[in-house]
């Protein structure tokens, strides 16, 4: 195929053999041919550019559609779905669809997802801290439970010992009043016999001042509290067991 340079060389060789008019016609024909070839090439490139622009527009529409917040992806990031999270302990960003539709900065679902992921990471830190606090509280409760269990076992042992002592002494077969007296004695209450006039001038209970004309001894209950205060109650026939029991419990 003859190139442009070859054609020019050929023209130069024929300059002397042809007249000027023929030479001009050949040059014009050559220029026209080059122009047509160039125009065809430009049309081809213009067509390619148009096709690429259409592809760009289509791709942008697809990207915008992906970024757009629809019903499905909005529900995925909606904070109202996180029912296990207390709103008081952790605050999520509330993505409002109506407001996001008017704002380009919040109308990108991927930006919203990234923001929600950051919030979830922060929530994970909060949950780990709360779990640590719960484990600490649980360990403290277990420690208190063990102490209470040991105390309960100690009380049960003392109660079993008391019941065994009562059973060995035959107290269980005695009168209920005697059982109460033995119980009071085990609680540190002293039961003594004393003449009625022994406490007539003392500072005991008013019932201790009750007079008795005979010189026989009466049963007395001497109650000592934690402050070593002594209270004396004369056990008289007119006093019921209920009164005596309540009196003793009040003084303990």
Curated annotation (Swiss-Prot):
Component of the NDC80 complex, which consists of NDC80, NUF2, SPC24 and SPC25. This is Probable kinetochore protein SPC24. The keyword Cell division applies. CDD domains: RWD_Spc24. One of its GO terms (biological process) is sister chromatid biorientation. The gene is SPC24. Belongs to the SPC24 family. Acts as a component of the essential kinetochore-associated NDC80 complex, which is required for chromosome segregation and spindle checkpoint activity. Residues 206-217 have a biased composition (Low complexity). One of its GO terms (cellular component) is nucleus. It is found in: Nucleus; Chromosome, Centromere, Kinetochore. It comes from Candida albicans (strain SC5314 / ATCC MYA-2876). Pfam families: Spc24.
